[in-house]
């Protein structure tokens, strides 16, 4: 037996070198075994990995190591999502080129990731800023262009005049750019878009096939796609009230049943009718400008005060020519949703009710809850949006709301204005085409040329990649590509005239929408994928990443896979068979007396009574212990993975990340928890060494029979093996760790009873101890791979445990010899009885009736009936 402590600093780099030297994690594409593809969302090379990365990649690594041990051909690659704005910011702030900054960060982070002991195939590594990667992205852009999946169109955009770039709606805060603080302008610009809307219905329906995705993620995507069935209505306008004699206003509604409750029409500030009305109405023009200044993000609009401006235009009710409705420009209507216009029925829509209450337009209920007297239905501050019967609706009265919808559709579809029906059933989607144009340097160049004679001309494929110039400066606002003296000036490949390159680059979401396919054969120099290989290795069997990517990244990847199928690069529709969203790593916050934040390594904490007291280690100054929050640099509640690995080792960090909390929930970082993981690692090391000593007495061959104690240990070992195997497959890693701890306790108790002196050990006990220790090492090898290699050799095994096959479960050892049954008397639990699993009913009845609690409950009377549910429960009827 050894008394030495396990030395992680010595062992971990040694075993990492052994894995690398033998290239045991390299995946062969021609391997005939069944494949298993596990992938964590690849990181942005910011310069340092954070503790959340450790958790994310440890989760994937456990799966990869387990499936490899189960005999699968595992693909577990790593790369870098390397384009993006931070590199440009670094160029501005630190006077370092984006390329140099990015690749320096990759080098540093790769070293950190290697220190975690991840079983990655580094031979497949790439960065999305590698020309050898984005060359193929540019080729696919041209393929999409030919297939009608990429187009250039004019779009209204948010323009930051200081940063000179387009902003997403979410980047406009209180009418100002999130970064520059400049007042945002609404402009119309040519933008490149991917036609994701061509797949709206397919993307929606296919969510039902993704049964290994979290329900919340599928729901978020379902809501984002936003399918709604309704009616497209053409409201006639009173020409005497319109600026240019406009004849109609189109609206899309999902509630045509509420038409008789209409009180107003509302149009978006940038609706053509609003723009026309504002030309001769300065007050309206100012109102529209104010709406734009207040922000365009949906979340911001939803929470803003509802505001409107009466244009003076009147719309005519489709069922009554004498009934007109005022047309307002409203700040809560967006042009990109539906038609940019609505009719407002305030009694049955809260937003509309808030609006009419402000402007005194009143409301008329038209849907009455079942069983309620319509005369008593009064709407004041809360709209009724439930089902019911129609009231105050003329020919619809008495119908259900659903029947009323059909009746309105039937009548208006048959009524013609000109050569078009007044109403038309339509399916509407919230999803909009994906605008990919970004006015930034550090991104994938869009491979088109603008010619004054030929218009938009694709770059010939033999001229790909269109690479970024490196001699750029960032001394002017806007896109450095626009300012470059030569890069954008080219000759048109069609006519030879002077032309210019497209200076917009692609949204970085494009880079991450197909990288998983490239990993299947990153050595292909002529095409994005090798279809034969990609179709065999894909889809990704288990994808892991944060829930913050539940909508855009995952939805764009699903679109891209379909677009790649349409252009011959893949043959499947869905990229990810299984999706798992891990929780965050969170930490307490510590606030100093001056209001500043202290980092965990600056704070000392001691127990005081039933509470805790925190002070600054340097000064003894009291520190307020704040809420447990997501780790952030601003609140300084971060933990450096290098410090943890340097102090305790990677296996300790990995084990802590997997323990206690289910992996889909947040894990609270605590120094005590890390120390506990470190102590358990040392305990495992001692246990294995003691077992190795005892195992020296074990016969080479498995004994023919086992005594009671040896059999009990074997049952515990194979029971743990079964539970941990099931737990990993179900991603219940914290449960697996609890099972391993429990089994380690059983092994320790057995060693304590029998000792390790080989002369004192019976062959069956010695053999069982060696088997149990071997199984234990293999159970924790996916979680603590370095320790497991050290333990594997301590037990006398040759080779690497990382290459060993997962132990076979002996199912007959999982059958329990006894079973404990709860006993009820007249429906109330009175006790339990333990009997042999194979005990016949008469034997069980005798044991039950012998229980004192049962005799007392029966009051000395015989039982009238005993009902035995096999292996479950016994019911005694007195």
From Swiss-Prot:
Top-level EC class: ligase
Keyword Mitochondrion: no
Motif 'KMSKS' region per UniProt: ranges: 630-634
SUPFAM superfamilies according to UniProt: Anticodon-binding domain of a subclass of class I aminoacyl-tRNA synthetases, Nucleotidylyl transferase, ValRS/IleRS/LeuRS editing domain
GO biological process, one term: leucyl-tRNA aminoacylation
HAMAP family referenced in this protein's UniProt entry, alphabetically: Leu_tRNA_synth_B
Name of the protein in its database record: Leucine--tRNA ligase
Gene of this entry: leuS
């Amino acid at each position: 037996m050894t008394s030495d402590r396990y030395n992680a600093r010595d062992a971990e780099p040694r075993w990492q070198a052994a894995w690398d030297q033998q290239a045991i994690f390299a995946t062969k594409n021609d391997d005939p075994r069944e494949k298993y593809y596990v992938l964590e969302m690849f990181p942005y090379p910011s310069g340092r990995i954070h503790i959340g990365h450790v958790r994310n990649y440890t989760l994937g690594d456990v799966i990869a190591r387990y499936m490899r041990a189960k005999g699968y051909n595992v693909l577990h690659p790593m790369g870098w999502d390397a384009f993006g704005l931070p590199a440009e910011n670094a160029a501005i702030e630190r006077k370092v080129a984006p390329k140099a900054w990015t690749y320096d960060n990759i080098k540093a982070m790769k070293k950190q990731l290697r220190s975690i002991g991840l079983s990655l195939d580094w031979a497949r590594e790439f960065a999305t800023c590698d020309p050898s990667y984005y060359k193929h992205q540019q080729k696919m852009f041209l393929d999409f262009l030919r297939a009608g999946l990429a187009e250039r169109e004019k779009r209204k955009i948010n323009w930051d005049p200081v940063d000179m770039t387009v902003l997403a709606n979410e980047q406009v805060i209180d009418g100002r750019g999130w970064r520059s603080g400049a007042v945002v302008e609404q402009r119309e610009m040519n933008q490149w878009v991917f036609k994701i809307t061509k797949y709206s219905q397919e993307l929606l329906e296919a969510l039902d096939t993704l049964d290994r995705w979290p329900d919340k993620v599928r729901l978020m995507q379902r809501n984002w796609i936003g399918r709604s069935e309704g009616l497209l209505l053409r409201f006639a306008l009173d020409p005497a009230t319109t600026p240019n004699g406009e004849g109609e206003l189109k609206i899309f509604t999902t509630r045509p049943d509420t038409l008789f409750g209409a009180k107003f029409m509302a149009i978006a500030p940038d609706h053509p009718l609003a723009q026309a009305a504002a030309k001769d109405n300065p007050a309206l023009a100012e109102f529209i400008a104010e709406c734009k200044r207040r922000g365009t993000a949906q979340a911001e609009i939803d929470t803003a005060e509802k505001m409107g401006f009466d244009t003076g235009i009147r719309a005519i009710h489709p069922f009554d020519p004498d009934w007109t409705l005022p047309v307002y420009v409203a700040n809560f209507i967006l042009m990109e949703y539906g038609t940019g216009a609505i009719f407002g029925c305030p009694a049955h829509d809260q937003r509309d009710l808030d609006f009419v209450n402000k402007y005194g337009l009143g409301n008329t209920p038209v849907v009455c809850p079942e069983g309620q007297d319509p005369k008593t239905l009064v709407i004041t501050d809360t709209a009724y949006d439930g089902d019911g019967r129609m009231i105050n609706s003329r020919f619809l009265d008495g119908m259900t709301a659903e029947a009323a919808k059909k009746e309105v559709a039937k009548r208006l579809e048959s009524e013609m204005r000109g050569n078009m029906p007044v109403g038309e059933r339509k399916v509407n989607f919230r999803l909009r085409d994906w605008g990919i144009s970004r006015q930034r340097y550090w991104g994938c160049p869009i491979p088109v040329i603008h010619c004054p004679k030929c218009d938009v001309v694709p770059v010939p494929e033999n001229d790909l990649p269109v690479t970024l110039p490196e001699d750029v400066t960032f001394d002017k606002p806007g896109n450095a590509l626009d300012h470059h003296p030569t890069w954008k000036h080219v000759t048109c490949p069609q006519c030879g005239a002077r032309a210019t390159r497209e200076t917009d680059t692609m949204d970085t979401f494009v880079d991450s929408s197909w990288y998983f396919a490239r990993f299947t054969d990153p050595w292909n120099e002529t095409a994005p994928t090798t279809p034969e290989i990609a179709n065999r290795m894909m889809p990704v069997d288990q994808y892991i990443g944060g829930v913050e990517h539940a909508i855009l990244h995952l939805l764009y990847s699903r679109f891209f896979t379909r677009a790649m199928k349409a252009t011959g690069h893949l043959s499947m529709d869905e990229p990810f068979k299984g999706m798992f969203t891990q929780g965050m790593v969170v930490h307490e916050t510590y606030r100093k007396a001056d209001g500043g934040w202290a980092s965990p390594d600056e704070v000392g904490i001691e127990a005081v009574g039933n509470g805790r007291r925190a002070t600054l280690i340097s000064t003894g100054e009291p520190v307020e212990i704040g809420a447990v929050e997501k780790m952030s640099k601003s609140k300084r509640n971060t933990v450096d993975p290098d410090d943890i690995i340097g102090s305790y080792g990677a296996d300790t960090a990995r084990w802590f990340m997997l323990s206690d909390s289910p992996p889909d929930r947040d894990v609270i970082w605590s120094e005590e928890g890390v120390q506990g993981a470190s102590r358990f690692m040392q305990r495992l090391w001692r246990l294995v060494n003691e077992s190795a000593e005892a195992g020296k007495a074990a016969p080479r061959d498995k004994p023919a029979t086992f005594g009671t104690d040896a059999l009990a240990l074997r049952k515990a070992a194979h029971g743990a093996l079964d539970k941990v195997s099931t737990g990993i497959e179900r991603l219940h890693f914290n449960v697996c760790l609890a099972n391993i701890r429990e089994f380690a306790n059983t092994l320790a108790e057995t060693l304590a009873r029998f000792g390790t002196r080989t002369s004192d050990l019976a062959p069956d006990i010695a053999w069982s101890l060696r088997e149990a220790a071997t199984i234990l090492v293999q159970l924790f090898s996916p979680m603590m791979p370095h320790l497991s290699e050290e333990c594997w050799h301590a037990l006398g095994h040759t080779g690497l445990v990382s290459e060993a096959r997962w132990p076979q479960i002996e199912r007959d050892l999982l059958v329990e010899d006894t079973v404990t049954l709860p006993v009820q008397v007249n429906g109330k639990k009175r006790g339990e009885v333990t009997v042999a699993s194979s005990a016949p009913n008469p034997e069980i009845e005798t044991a039950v009736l012998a229980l004192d609690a049962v005799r007392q409950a029966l009051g000395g009377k015989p039982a009238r009936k005993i009902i035995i549910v096999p292996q479950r429960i016994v019911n005694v009827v007195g």
